[in-house]
Amino acid sequence: MASDNALPSAAPLISVVVPVRNEAPNIAPLIAEIRAALVGVVHEIVYVDDGSTDATPQELAAARAVGAPLRILRHRASCGQSAAVITGVKAARGEWIATLDGDGQNDPADIPRLLARAQAEAVKGVPVLIAGHRVNRRDSTVKRFSSRFANRFRAWMLRDATPDSGCGLKVFSRALFLSLPHFDHMHRFLPALTLRAGGVVISEPVNHRPRVRGKSNYGTLDRLAVSFLDLIGVAWLQRRGKRPVIEPEA
């Protein structure tokens, strides 16, 4: 087994993909938590810096210099969270992918449990997405209310049976993700896209923590406006997707 202090020489079981933009104060603490959560698991950590203008690149370089199993990818200019996730998953070497936000609000300690559930479901032969569900959210009242409204409206439109599609903590196979359509803001619709592809979505309760360092790079109204437009597009995709049942060759 590879050392926890270096990238594994063989393909890791899981790649933890973390998209970040201007999260310098959260880099070192979150990487330490990811490493602690995955002790004994062959893993890599893939950070995608989405055009940060603060000290995020320097903090990432410092973390790698002290031995973190870390890969660093960088967008020259900000392209958005979904683009960063896509970049990270494409570069990842693990069979399984865990995504989480870079602000420290998702708890890496939940990753092993979600991974175990994904592996247990995978033996059934159907692609699976394990989606985190932030049961006790530690956000402002405005953010909680807007998220609740958006989740209910999305569930009504897409029938994705997911109470918290916006949770950044998810576990899925790399193969599943690469088979999905890729577009801006797709990370918000992974459950619906997985169902459209014939997969299964399972929501698991996860810990959620208040942001203690830095500030959000996205405004609530901006998220709502963008999500509504994308929602229409995903609904369009759903209604035009067909999965034929192919009979055995004669």
Locations of the language-model features?
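Donor nucleotide-sugar binding loop of glycosyltransferases
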Residues: 23-26, 52, 81, 107
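Conserved donor nucleotide-binding strand/loop of the catalytic core
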Residues: 43-46, 57-91
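Short, well-formed alpha-helical segments that are part of the catalytic scaffolds
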Residues: 23-37
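Terminal low-complexity segments of carbohydrate-biosynthetic enzymes
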Residues: 3-6, 229-250
